[in-house]
Every structure is written in structure tokens, then in C-alpha cells.
């Protein structure tokens, strides 16, 4: 979810009910979890497969070294000016923090009055 959130912040098109402060706080927490320790990097300094540390069993057959750098897309907001609300808004609890603390939170979903089905056969 980091890459789409970062892109939406960069495009200044965050969904209603999702603030810049929430997105920045969530992205920052994930980045700290991933990058504060050195267990996500091999002896050559390259990223390894895993959320936290080396977890090669989570790889799919199509995973390759380039796949490991998709998290870098979460840095897209670095292209926003320092005065942008993404940087200047106060940090706020994000959806999972609200959910697990018992606070009210908006459901993340798409609603459509039109029901579409698709035959698979």
C-alpha cells in the first residue's frame, strides 16, 4: 500500500477522509520498520527479499532483484515542496491504528450501484 499512497499524495489526490498527516505518519512508520535495522540489506548493501530481514520464502516465481526496489516508489513525496501539507500537517493516526485502538474509522472500499458479473466459462 505504500506505493499507491505515496503516488496519491504526490498527485495531491488522496481519497476523502485520508489526510496528508495520516499518510506521512503511516509511510514513516513502515519505512522505519524496514530500514532502521540492517537486516534488510545483504553484505553488498543491496535489499533482500522480505518485509523485515531476509525472508526468501515470501518470493513469487517472478520476483527478481528489480522487484526489491519497488519500495523506493514510497519516496515519491520527496518531490513535494517542504511547505506542502504532506510535510507540514501534524501526524495523525492512520486507519489500522484507529481500527486496533477501537477508534472510529472510515471503511476502505469502492461502492457502485451497478453490479457486474463475469462468466468464467
Where on the chain are the PLM-derived regions?
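Terminal, non-catalytic domain-edge segments
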Residues: 4-121
Amino acid at each position: 500500500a505504500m506505493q499507491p499512497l505515496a503516488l496519491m499524495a504526490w498527485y495531491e489526490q488522496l481519497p476523502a477522509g485520508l489526510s496528508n498527516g495520516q499518510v506521512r505518519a503511516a509511510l514513516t512508520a513502515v519505512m522505519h520498520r524496514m530500514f532502521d535495522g540492517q537486516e534488510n540489506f545483504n553484505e553488498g548493501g543491496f535489499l533482500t527479499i522480505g518485509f523485515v530481514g531476509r525472508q526468501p520464502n515470501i518470493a513469487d516465481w517472478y520476483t527478481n532483484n528489480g522487484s526489491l526496489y519497488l519500495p523506493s516508489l514510497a519516496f515519491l513525496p520527496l518531490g513535494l515542496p517542504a511547505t506542502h501539507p504532506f510535510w507540514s500537517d501534524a501526524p495523525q493516526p492512520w486507519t489500522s491504528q484507529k481500527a486496533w485502538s477501537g477508534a472510529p474509522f472510515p471503511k476502505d472500499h469502492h461502492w457502485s450501484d451497478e453490479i457486474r458479473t463475469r462468466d468464467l466459462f
